[in-house]
Amino acid sequence: MGCSAKARWAAGALGVAGLLCAVLGAVMIVMVPSLIKQQVLKNVRIDPSSLSFNMWKEIPIPFYLSVYFFDVMNPSEILKGEKPQVRERGPYVYREFRHKSNITFNNNDTVSFLEYRTFQFQPSKSHGSESDYIVMPNILVLGAAVMMENKPMTLKLIMTLAFTTLGERAFMNRTVGEIMWGYKDPLVNLINKYFPGMFPFKDKFGLFAELNNSDSGLFTVFTGVQNISRIHLVDKWNGLSKVDFWHSDQCNMINGTSGQMWPPFMTPESSLEFYSPEACRSMKLMYKESGVFEGIPTYRFVAPKTLFANGSIYPPNEGFCPCLESGIQNVSTCRFSAPLFLSHPHFLNADPVLAEAVTGLHPNQEAHSLFLDIHPVTGIPMNCSVKLQLSLYMKSVAGIGQTGKIEPVVLPLLWFAESGAMEGETLHTFYTQLVLMPKVMHYAQYVLLALGCVLLLVPVICQIRSQVGAGQRAARADSHSLACWGKGASDRTLWPTAAWSPPPAAVLRLCRSGSGHCWGLRSTLASFACRVATTLPVLEGLGPSLGGGTGS
C-alpha cells in the first residue's frame, strides 16, 4: 500500500531534517579541523589573551627533583690505587617550584623573562633525610689537583701545603643538605681571595647551591604572535645568540626552546630541541613512539645514543672535546674549569669501560634513560623525566700529596631525575578542551552526515511505495475489467469491426447493469468501450429528428 497524506507530510519533514543534518555534517567535516587548528594556534602563543599564558607564566605541573648519591665505600683503598666501590643512596626528593618574572614583550615578536626556581625537601617521597651522611670525593681538592697537573712543581707543593693547613682531604663525609645547598669551606674563601672570579660561590660550596632561589639566565624567546612556526624558540640567552664554551660554531649554537613548551602540530619526523643552561649546550631528542597519558595522545621523545658520544664516534660532537671515553661530556669549560663530566646515569649508552672501572654501577635502559611525552597538537609536555649524572675525573697528581695513588677514573658523584606530570584540575581541563571536545566534534560530524543520509531515504522510500501501490491497484483494476468483459461476450470479442454498428446486447446488459463492476474500472479500453456501447443507441434514436430538422 502507498503512504497516506499525513505520512507523506511526515516523510517530507524528515527529509528536510535529513538534508539539514547531512549539510551540517559535511560542513563540519570541512570546517572543524580548520577551526580546531585556529583555536590551537590562538591559544598556545605567548600572549596575555591566550589560554596557555598563565600555564606558561606559572607552570601548574608539579616538578620533582630526585637526587641519588654514590656513597664511596672504600676511600682509603682508592688512595692506594684500588678500584672504587660505590653504593647508590636515595632518592632524596625535592619539590621544585618555578615562576617567571621580569616578563617584557619586545617589538620583534619576542618576550624576555627570568625564571626562578626554589626547592623544598619532601621527606614522604624520600628514602632518607637531608641529615644523612655521604662519603664522596672532595671536588675542590681533587678538581684543583687535576687543574694543577701541568703547573710548576713549586706551585703544586704550595697547593699541597695549603690543603694540609686547611685540613682538606681527598674524600669528605658531608650531609645531603650540605652537598646539595652548600657548606662553609676555608678553601672557598682562599680561592676567592687569590683567584677572584674563578668560582661562582661566595661563602659556601654546594653542587646545587646556584639553582635554589635563583634564575637560570635571561631568556628571550619568540611569542608566535606574528610567526607561529617560531613559537617558544630561543632568540637569545643572557643577550647571546650563541655561547662560547665550546670549540665549534655548531656546538655553540643555541637551538630549540627553553625546554618547557614546543611548537604545535608535531609529527613523528619532528625533533625536540632545547637549550640547557645547566649543561651549557643545546640538546636534541628524537621521536621514539606514540602513546597515551591519562587518555591524552602523546609522542615520546628520547635521547639518541649519540647525545654524549665523543668526536670519534659522532664527529659533530668534536667541538665538545677534549673528550675521554664516548658517552660522557666534559663540562669543565662552563663549570669553573673543574674536570666534571655529564652523562646518562650509571654511564648508560657510554663506553662499557667506564662502568666497569667502578664497582656498584648497573646501567639500565628503563630506569636510567630520559624521556619527554609531548601532546603533539599543542607541543605541551604531559609527562617527562630528564635524568643526568655528574661525575668527577680524578687521578694521582705528582706533587699534590692528597691525591695519593689514585688510578685515573671518572667517578660518579650523583645522578638526578627532574620529573613532572600533568595532574589534577589542570589535567582535567586540558583533557576536556583539547581531547574530549575535539573528539566529540570529530564523531558528531560523521554521525550527522550518516543520520542525514538515513533521513533523506524516508521520503524516497515513501514515494517509491506510493508508486508501487498505484501500479498494483491499476493492475488489479485491469484484471477485473477483463473478467467483467468476458462475462458479457462469450466469444471474447470486444467489438464488431464495422464502424458505428450496434453493440452486442450482452455488452449493453453488462455495461448498464454492472456499474459496480464495469463503470468503476480504470482500464482505458474497457471504460471507453462501455461508454460507447451505452451512447450509440441514444445517438441512433436522435438521428431521424436531427435529420428532419435539417431538412426543414
From Swiss-Prot:
GO MF, one example: high-density lipoprotein particle binding
Gene: SCARB1
Record keyword Transmembrane present: yes
Superkingdom of the organism of origin: Eukaryota
Protein name: Scavenger receptor class B member 1
Major location category of this protein: membrane
SS bond list: C251-C384
Subunit (UniProt): The C-terminal region binds to PDZK1.
